[in-house]
Amino acid sequence: MSFNTIIDWNSCTAEQQRQLLMRPAISASESITRTVNDILDNVKARGDDALREYSAKFDKTTVNALKVSAEEIAAASERLSDELKQAMAVAVKNIETFHTAQKLPPVDVETQPGVRCQQVTRPVASVGLYIPGGSAPLFSTVLMLATPARIAGCKKVVLCSPPPIADEILYAAQLCGVKDVFNVGGAQAIAALAFGTESVPKVDKIFGPGNAFVTEAKRQVSQRLDGAAIDMPAGPSEVLVIADSGATPDFVASDLLSQAEHGPDSQVILLTPDADMAHQVAEAVERQLAELPRAETARQALNASRLIVTKDLAQCVEISNQYGPEHLIIQTRNARDLVDGITSAGSVFLGDWSPESAGDYASGTNHVLPTYGYTATCSSLGLADFQKRMTVQELSKEGFSALASTIETLAAAERLTAHKNAVTLRVNALKEQA
């Protein structure tokens, strides 16, 4: 189905509607699964030697020193323009402001007299950040991951990226205070972070996007007892735009294309109650597409994308919630009025002047978001992902005495005798003291 085909939602059957909201299938082929498993085992067994071999094989690069020196990072910084450095500084400031505001206040309550319960927060001790390389290095992801890691207080932050690492990535690491940077990419980088090697430290949790091999490696290490936790399941990038007749077609088209250019498996959807708007957006997409360097990539993504006309904005919201987009852009006359009805979205952008690019780079929200329908249960990345919560309880003699019979009754009902005895022994000890 061509992206220029405008679909009337209410003329479709329930099955056709379901098909319209289906995402392009993603699944690791058996060969990818096997290849990744072999890479993980090899890196775990052979450490740095395996990493160097994979760099030569996949990156066509000879890596002598896996760790990037402070001198190399400083030199990279000198090669960047002041304009780019200033832009990064503004982005970091906004990201820092928003994520600092996410700090949870401690919880300290007395649930009943003499029974004190607390919730305290601790940082994840060590985290690994994977930053893809290639022709368009995602240095903005360094800012999005390293900034909350620093605010959370993670003691060790390790960054891996395929060699040769772009100057922008090295400077972003320096700007965010990341000192441990390694010339390692692909599934082998995930293996190094999960298991550790002679050079690369093992970490507790791994963050960051990547290709099918990286995604599969993250999945596999998260399921191994000796592996590492991961940030969230990953899928292709996606955006859904809700627009009414008051929207600017060129703005809508630019937002759709900003996601389509990510990759051929990206998906973009327009929902509008205005058929004229759908036609105008389709025309604007074609005009803008002709000017894009990544036009072919975007055009492939548009093959799995949709222009859908609904009966009203309420139906747009209903359909959006069914789909649960990674990015939701609302370009309507009263965009904020729709927010309360939104139940599933990674990040929401309101009004004509809130392009998705703002969240990708510099507004302050995080651009690491759940995709592929995971918005139903997963949240956008935030400070909490670099922290863990711990509960504390303390009972005084009086508090324990008042609660003892309740605990004994519940434990007995579950036939957990040792649980009951742990209370009864203390009750008897108090009686002897009396």
Curated annotation (Swiss-Prot):
Which residues take part in binding Zn(2+)? Answer: Q259, H262, D360, H419
Q: What is the lineage of its organism?
A: Bacteria, Pseudomonadati, Pseudomonadota, Gammaproteobacteria, Enterobacterales
Identify the domain of life.
Answer: Bacteria
Sorted alphabetically, the Gene Ontology cellular component annotations on this record are: cytosol
Read off the Gene3D superfamilies from this record.
1.20.5.1300, Nitrogenase molybdenum iron protein domain (3.40.50.1980)
Q: Which reaction does it catalyse?
A: L-histidinol + 2 NAD(+) + H2O = L-histidine + 2 NADH + 3 H(+)
Q: What class of enzyme is it?
A: oxidoreductase
What is the protein name for this chain? Histidinol dehydrogenase
- Entries under HAMAP family matching the protein: HisD
Subunit structure and binding partners: Homodimer.
Q: How are cofactors bound according to the entry's free-text note? A: Binds 1 zinc ion per subunit.
Q: Which NCBIfam families match?
A: hisD (TIGR00069)
**Required co-factors:** Zn(2+)
* Molecular functions (GO terms): histidinol dehydrogenase activity; NAD binding; zinc ion binding
Q: Which UniProt keywords apply?
A: Amino-acid biosynthesis, Histidine biosynthesis, Metal-binding, NAD, Oxidoreductase, Zinc
**Similarity-based family:** Belongs to the histidinol dehydrogenase family.
